[in-house]
Amino acid sequence: MDIRKAYLDFFASKGHEITPSSPLVPDDATLLFTNAGMVPFKSIFTGEIPRPNPPRKTSCQTCIRAGGKHNDLDNVGYTARHHTFFEMLGNFSFGDYFKEQAIAYAWEFVTEFLKLPKDRLYVTVHENDDEAFNLWQKHIQKERIYKFGDKDNFWQMGDTGPCGPCSEIFYDQGEEHFNSSEDYMGGDGDRFLEIWNLVFMQYERSADGVLSPLPKPSIDTGMGLERVTAIKEGKFSNFDSSLFMPIINEISKLCNKTYIYESGASFRVIADHIRSSVFLLAQGVSFDKEGRGYVLRRILRRALRHGYLLGFKQAFMYKLVDVVCDLMGGHYTYLNEKKDFIKEQIRLEEERFLSTIENGIEIFNEELKNTKEIFSGEVAFKLYDTYGFPLDLTADMLREKNLKVDEEKFELLMNEQKARAKASWKGSGDKTASGDFKNLLEKFGENHFVGYEKAECESKILALLDEDFKEVSTLKDAGWVMLKNTPFYATSGGQSADSGFMAKREVLDTQKFFNLNLSFVKAGEELKVGDIVHARIDTEKREQIARHHSATHLLHHALREILGSHVSQAGSLVESNKLRFDFTHHKALSKEELENIEKRVNEMIINSSEAILENMPLEEAKKSGAIALFNEKYQGNVRVLTLGESKELCGGTHVKNTAQIGSFYIVKESGVSAGVRRIEAVVSKAALEFVKNQLEELSKVKDELKNNDILSGIKKLKNEILSLKNELKNSSKTELDSKNIQGVEICVKRIDNGDIKAMIDDFKNKFAKAVILLIQVKDEKITLAAGVKDVPLKAGALVKEAAQILGGNGGGRDDFATAGGKDLSKINEALKQSLETIEKAL
C-alpha cells in the first residue's frame, strides 16, 4: 500500500489542496531545517500572510532533525523510531473546519483506509478539552480516551503566538510483545505508539501568558510516514519496514555481514544517514565547515564511523545512493536528476574523512586507556581540528563506553584558537525585532508593487518608521516609508533593491518585512502619514540590474546544458554592475568549459529572444518545464519567465529581449564550499568597462616586459626563473651520508638547507631498498620527513615517533610522511631513536 499517496488522495477528496513538500532549507531565519509539516504554513498561522484559498491544505513534508533545538542525531540507530530525515503527513485547516471534522477525518482514514483494528486504538486529549473528549466518543469507547496535561497535550509555536490543546491517536503494539513497567498509556514504553497528532490551534498567547480565543481557529496535524508504515506492515521498528530494509540489505551485501536487529545499530545509523545526505545534497546543501553544510558533514561522518565498525575501510556510502533513489525517486523525481552529482559529492567527502579516520581512532583509543569518566577536551579538540572528527562523533563513540567528553575544555580551546564555529543563524528578523510589522499588516494589508509596469507613480504614505523601526507620524530624519503602491523593487531572490526618489527624498534601499515593501530614505524635507508623494526609481540602475538578472537565467541554462542536469542554483547576487551565480558542481571548471559557457550565453543573447512572462499555478509551471529553486518559497500562482531556451520561476525584473543584455564576460570562477562553485560575470556597460580595464592591464604588462609580444616576453622570463631555480637547488644541495644494513641503504640526518622532499625522493631513487629520515631547522621551526622504499617499515610511524620526542606530531603515507616539532634541544635524541627503530625493523 502506498500510504503517502493514499493519505494525499484521501484529503484531496475532502477538499484539501495537495501542497508539494517545501524545501528542507526553510524561509525562516529561526530554523536550521524544516523540522515539521507545519513549518511551510507558519506565516499563515501567525497572520503574517493572508489565509489561502482554498483554506484547506494537505502535504507530505520532508523533514530534518539533526541540528539546533530539534536534534535527534544522538538517538538514531539506538531506538526504533528516531530519524534525522523523515516524512510528515499532514492536513491543515486555516480558519475553516475545526475539531469535529478533524477528528472525523482522522478516524475515517485510520480505520477505513489504513484498516487498523479499532481495538488497538487509543486517544488522548487535553485534561480541560471537554469538547474534544465528547467528540471522540462518537467514534471510540470512553474507556479508550485518556486525559493528560500541558506537557503531553498542549502545543505552542513559541512563548507567544498561536497555540492550543492537541489530541493524539495511539496504536497498541500488543502486550505479548511489550511488558515493561513503562508499557501503559502515558508511560515511556514502546507498547503504545503515537501515530497521529491533531493540534487544535484556538488560542493566542500574549507576552504576559494570557490565552485569548482566536477568531478563526485552525487545524495542524502530523503523522509520521515511517511510523505508520511500520505499523501497517506489522513491524516493531521503523527500520524493519519497506522504507529502510532495501538500504539495510544493500549495506549487508557490501560488507558481507548479516543484519541482526539486536546488534545492528551501525546498519540503522547508515541507513538513516544516507537518506538525510541524499535529500540535503539534492536540495543544494553542500558539505561545509559551518551552518547547514556542517550538519550534513556531521551526519555523513557519523555514518562513516559506523561503517568503519562494520569493516568498511574504503568509500562505500556513495554506493547506497542508487537504492535511496530507487525507493523514493518515484515521488521525489528530482533525486533521479541529481543522482550522479550526489554520488560524486558523497564519494569525495568519504575520501576526505577516510584519509584521517584511522589515525584519529588510534589517537582516540590511546586516550581511552587513560580515561576513567571524562575524556580529555584537549584530545577531543585535536581530533576535531586535525582529523575532522566533529565533537558529537567523539561523544557518540564515548557513549558506547558509558563515558563523557570534557566539552567545557573543548569549547575553551575552540574560542582561544578562533577555530571554525558553527554558523550564527540570525536573519533579517533580528534587525527588525522592535518593529510591529504584524500590526501594520493587519491595519493596511500588503502594499502593492507596481514596478513591473511603472517606473514612477503617485502614492499615499500609509506608515512611517524611524531607523529603529518604531512607528512615527512625521519623518525628517532618515527612516522607512510604507507606500500604498510602490515602484521600488525590494531585495529578493538575489536581486538588489531599486533606488531613486520619493518627493525630494533620496531612496537608498527597499526591503521586504513580513510581506511589506518598505523603502529607506535619506534625511530631508518632512514626510507625513497620509501624504501623496511622487515616487520614481533610478531607471538606469534598474535597467542594468535587469540585464544582469536576465543573464543569470541564461548562465543557469548554459551550465545545465554543458555541465549536466545536476547543476542547480545555490545562491545568487544581482547588482547593476555585476552578477554572482553559485551552483552545484563537484569540481573546478576547466578553461574549455568556461569558454564554452561564455560562448553559449552570448549565442543566446545574439538570438534576440523575446522575454515571455506568464502567471500560472505552481504545479502547472513545473509541468511546463520551468525550473523552481529549492531555497525559494512559492505560494499560489507563480511568475514564469521564458528567455529563449531558459524557463524559470522568477519574481525579479528583466529585459524585454535578450539582445538588450549586450555582451557577457566571465570574470572569475571559484569554489564556495565542497560541491558548490561560483561564477562572477558582467554584462552591458559593466562588460565594456571590464574589457577596457583588461586592455589597459595588457598595455601595462607590455610596458613592464619592454616587449609588445607578451607571450614571448613571459616565456623568456620563465626560462630565466627556471635557470635561477636550478642554480639555487645545486648550490643548496647537501650530500647525504648513508650506510647499508642487510642490503637496505639508511640515512638519518639533520640538514639546514635544501628541498627536504626532493632530497628524500633523490635518495630513494638511487637505491633498490632505502629508509631515510631528515630533520630540518629553519627560523627555529622544525620540519621532519621520512621516506621508505621496499622495506617493511611505515614512514608515517617512523616520523610520528621522532616528532613526539620533539613535542610535535604528524603522519602520512607508508612511503612518505612529514611532521613538525618544537623542542630543538631533543633533535639528537630523535635522530638516535629513529636509527634504533630502523635497525630493529631490519
Swiss-Prot record:
One of its GO terms (biological process) is alanyl-tRNA aminoacylation. Its cofactor is Zn(2+). It is found in: Cytoplasm. Keywords: Aminoacyl-tRNA synthetase, ATP-binding, Cytoplasm, Ligase, Metal-binding, Nucleotide-binding, Protein biosynthesis, RNA-binding, tRNA-binding, Zinc. Binds 1 zinc ion per subunit. Zn(2+) binds at H549, H553, C650, H654. CDD domains: AlaRS_core. Consists of three domains; the N-terminal catalytic domain, the editing domain and the C-terminal C-Ala domain. The editing domain removes incorrectly charged amino acids, while the C-Ala domain, along with tRNA(Ala), serves as a bridge to cooperatively bring together the editing and aminoacylation centers thus stimulating deacylation of misacylated tRNAs. This is Alanine--tRNA ligase. It comes from Campylobacter jejuni subsp. jejuni serotype O:6 (strain 81116 / NCTC 11828).
